Structure formats: C-alpha cells, structure tokens
Swiss-Prot record:
Protein's name according to its UniProt entry: Glutamate 5-kinase
Residues that, per the record, bind ATP: K16, T175, D176
Organism: Saccharophagus degradans (strain 2-40 / ATCC 43961 / DSM 17024)
NCBIfam families, per database record: proB (TIGR01027)
Pathway(s) of this molecule: Amino-acid biosynthesis; L-proline biosynthesis; L-glutamate 5-semialdehyde from L-glutamate: step 1/2
CDD domains given in the database record: AAK_G5K_ProB, PUA_G5K
GO molecular function, one term: ATP binding
Keywords: Amino-acid biosynthesis, ATP-binding, Cytoplasm, Kinase, Nucleotide-binding, Proline biosynthesis, Transferase
Length: 373
C-alpha cells in the first residue's frame, strides 16, 4: 500500500494553521481565508473524520485590537496581546463553524498539562470525548501563563504533541509554502519539491544544517514535529494552505505537498507520553555498551553503563540518555536522584548498597519507563 493511501484511509486528523496564513498582512485575522479552511474542515467532519485544529493567530489578533503596529518583544506584552486576541480568534472560528452546524471547543495547553501524567490523561480524555461528540477542539498554547523556559517553542511542535496525545493518524501542517524543497525555491529555480520522505531521513538533517533549505521559513521545525508525531505512528503532510480545496484533496490521497511518513509502529500509551514529554530534568551520557543494549536488546538501563550525569533531578523525573557524541538515544524516568546517580554511575548493580547504604532498584531506569527515540 502506498504511503498516500495510508493518509487516505486515516480518520483522525490534527490540522495546524500558522499565523502567516491566518493574519491579513499584519492587519488582524483574515476572515475570508479562515472561512475557506473552516469549510474544508467541516467537510471532513461531516464525513466522519475526527478533527482537532491547532491554530496560531492569537497574538496577531490581539495586536490589532490593541492598536499595536509592531510585534512586542517583552514577554508580558506578548502575553497581554495573546489574552486579548484569543477571544477574537475563538469567536471567529465559532462563527464560521456555526454555518455548518458544528460546535467548537477551546483548549489551552501548557507544558505542565503534558508533562504531568494525570493532567496528560485528563487532556486526552477531554479531546477524545469532544471529537466523539462531533465537536472540533481548537487548541493553542496557553500563552498568557507560560514563560520562555517552558514554551513548546512553536505550534508545529504543539500540533505534533496533540497528535501523540490523541493517537492521530495524520498531522496536516498548512503553511505559506506549497511544500518542502531540497533547496530554497526563491533562490534556485531548479529546486525540487520533496514528495515523500521518511520523517527520520537523515537527508533532511543535511538540508536543515548550515543555512540549508529547511533551515529557512520554519521548515526545520516542521521536520522536528513530523519526527515527534511519527513516534506514535502518525504521518505528517506539509502543504500550502492557499492551494484550492487543499484539505479534502490531501485527505483523498492526492499528491499535494510533502509527506513525511512514519516508519514506526505506534508505541504504547505510557511510552508515547514519555517520548512527547518536553521537560527533561537532566541527561545521562552512556557508554557504547549501554547504547547497544538499549537499542538492540530493549533492556533496562543499569548504573554501570552511565559515564556522566548532568542536571538536578529527583526520583521519578524524566532524563535524556545520550551517547558519547551527544546524540539522544532514549529518555525515561529515573529510579535514583541526580546525587545518587553520580555516586553509582559506572558501578555494577551489586555495589549500589555499599555506595549508597541502601538499594531500592537494580536498574537506574526500568525498561517499562524508558523509550527509544
């Protein structure tokens, strides 16, 4: 079966629309364009699709209502603009969806909602219930309360996290470019459009680095989002939002935009939460033997395989596991604090008691609490 056929068969979609598409050249929301996308999403919903919308535009809408000509730099002013604009954004969507007798719901998320296991499960339950009721949830980051340190970074990332959260089949990212290219089409008339690539194709990294084609126009963030979504088995489409009838055409399997497909089997719900958790508290550097055991045998991480410890963390918190070159291999929940881990790193499990004066676990991270990335 072709990869586009998988998209055609998918029925649970997350659709992300960026602010470059939603705003009318800095003059507030482009209601005419919003009406076009709402009509397309309504068509999917009427056909039985479960649709979740991740929408930018709150800050831009707020700037217009406040009479600000330039985007502010101060965080508190951005948050004020988001607070003012969010109501306008939701009201605009609600009015458009009402034309098709479709109800909407507003969902604001922050890191704590997705890093805390109980809140993560509550958010998942709410979103699933809404979509089963035929309601289209409109998701955005809770800009009014987040700080720079705990931001998702961009709504591409948020879209991928929502895709993981609801176990979506497809993440559709609408952008102001019609697809992804192997070089900048604005500078190279011979630039080739990327039709299909694995989300984990290393060639995408090569294009993204050192000012490569994907490093411009926010495309590298879309690659990262596709990789995050792929961990739960979702395929990602990056496609031009201004293409005529773009959403139904992509859903029908038509070759539009760039498909970044998943080669992964969907992982278990708990491990999907771990993979999408964006707030690690520390990092462990592993030796080659530990990396091999994790990758090839799927075993737990023992203290003997740890060479270095970075950060401050307590028991049960999330840490990254890296190889000696600094590449992330896995992430998981630790059984020992950073102080304890520093004392037992490089030691066999049989020595934990003598090094700490007690031993609660043989494993530093149990395989049930560890996910490869």
């Amino acid at each position: 079966m072709s990869k586009r056929q998988l998209v055609k068969q998918s029925r649970r979609w997350v659709i992300k629309i960026g602010s470059a598409l939603l705003t009318n050249n800095g003059r507030g929301l482009d209601r005419e364009e919003m009406a076009v996308w709402v009509k397309q999403m309504a068509a999917l919903s009427k056909r039985g699709y479960e649709v979740v919308l991740v929408s930018s535009g709150a800050v831009a809408a707020g700037m217009t209502r406040l009479g600000w000509a330039e985007r502010p730099k101060a965080l508190h002013e951005l948050q004020a603009a988001a607070a003012v604009g969010q109501s306008s954004l939701i009201q605009a969507y609600e009015q458009e969806f009402q034309k098709y007798s479709i109800k909407t719901a507003q969902i604001l998320l922050d890191h704590d909602d997705l890093s805390n296991r109980q809140r993560y499960l509550n958010a998942r339950s709410t979103l699933r219930t809404l979509t089963k009721l035929g309601v289209i949830p409109i998701v955005n980051e809770n800009d009014t309360v987040v700080t720079d340190e705990i931001r998702f970074g961009d709504n591409d990332t948020l879209g991928a996290l929502v895709a993981n959260l609801i176990e979506a089949d497809t993440l559709c990212i609408l952008t102001d470019q019609k697809a992804m290219f192997d070089s900048d089409p604005r500078q190279n008339a011979l630039a080739k459009m990327l039709i299909e690539r694995s989300a984990f194709d290393p060639g995408l990294d090569a294009m993204a680095g050192d000012g490569g084609a994907l490093g411009r126009g926010g495309m590298i963030s879309k690659v990262r989002a596709a990789r995050l979504a792929a961990r739960s088995g979702a395929n990602t489409i990056v496609v031009g939002g201004k293409v005529f009838d773009v959403i139904p055409r992509v859903a029908s399997g038509e070759i539009l935009g760039t498909l970044l497909y998943s080669e992964s089997q969907p992982i278990a719900a708990r491990k999907r939460w771990l993979a999408g958790n964006m707030q690690p508290r520390g990092r462990l550097t592993l030796d080659d033997g530990a990396v091999k055991v994790l990758r090839e045998q799927g075993k737990s991480l023992l203290p003997v395989g740890v060479r270095a410890v970075e950060g401050y963390f307590t028991r049960g918190e999330l840490v990254l596991c890296e190889d000696t070159a600094g590449r992330e291999i896995a992430r998981g929940l630790v059984n020992y604090s950073s102080d304890e881990t520093n004392k037992i790193k490089g030691a066999s499990s049989s020595r934990i008691d003598s090094l700490l004066g007690y031993k609660d676990y043989d494993e530093l991270i149990h395989r049930d609490n560890l996910v490869l990335v």
